[in-house]
């Protein structure tokens, strides 16, 4: 089985974004590649992920904001998550994006 990878641009601000974290984000997000494989074969898929440490006045400590924009033909799917745990934020982001992809595919097959 060939492992599918998509083009992913990752931007991180406000914290130390180590190579290990970069790889984690890539690995988690690449698990979605099978859902966009048909579009990716056309070379028309780009996933942009942004992760930032933010300060929310009603939270103590670190709060991470994660956002993903998936450029697919004729559409941009966008999801976001705010969480005190960066790893949880990344995984929730992936799950939300997967749901958006599935919803979009269902819409496309209905027409």
Give residue spans per PLM region.
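N-terminal, polar/charged subdomain of small-to-medium soluble alpha/beta proteins
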Residues: 2-111
